[in-house]
From Swiss-Prot:
Disulfide bonds: none annotated. One of its GO terms (molecular function) is carbon-carbon lyase activity. This is (5-formylfuran-3-yl)methyl phosphate synthase. Keywords: Lyase, Schiff base. HAMAP family: MfnB. Pfam families: 4HFCP_synth. The keyword Lyase applies. The keyword Lyase applies. It comes from the Archaea. Its EC number is 4.2.3.153.
Amino acid sequence: MKLLVSPINSEEAIIASIGGADIVDVKNPKEGSLGANFPWVIREVKAVVNGRQPISATIGDFNYKPGTAALAALGAAVAGADYIKVGLYDIQTESQALELLTKITRAVKDYNPLKKVVASGYSDYKRINSISPLLLPAVAAEAGVDVVMVDTGVKDGKSTFEFMDEKELKEFTDLAHSYGLENAIAGSLKFEDIPLLERIGPDIIGVRGMVCGGDRSTSIRQELVEKLVAECQA
């Protein structure tokens, strides 16, 4: 499994990079689960990582606003992100998801076809009034997305595993692979979840709180990144 670590600034990005993360992800927790950070922060992170890892950037937890989302996605791509991540938050139907993701993908790929688009559903979709992550792989594949992900929409300490069980997450992973997509799992993951994640088999796991010592509002610690890298590679 690849490890995606989400710093909030260039100082944390250096720690994540030196610690051995496979992907350095720029987000802004103050603005939500997949809260967008500023273009200059993406550029700063890109500069300090200096090619050691690809950079991903979140553009927000989006309801049905394809134009706004497409423009935000292009902004993240221009700022230097290699992966552009969008959360489908309060998306009511598969047709809404398809249009949103199609427009985002076009905005990114017209600029640079080598950049990857990541579509995230939410394990707690029922409490945020959005579509099931199990519907996402088929829609994402049709839209030309590269990676599908599941995360928690509400960051209250509850884990993805409290909303989707091993069977459902395995189904999500297998569906993604059946459509030729990479997939990722995130959402208040803990070190003790690693054996379960290995059974499920995602390509990528996404973390912040786990490498902050359990509190995503504190700072990333290099020794915890290194510990997690070792466990993911074991």
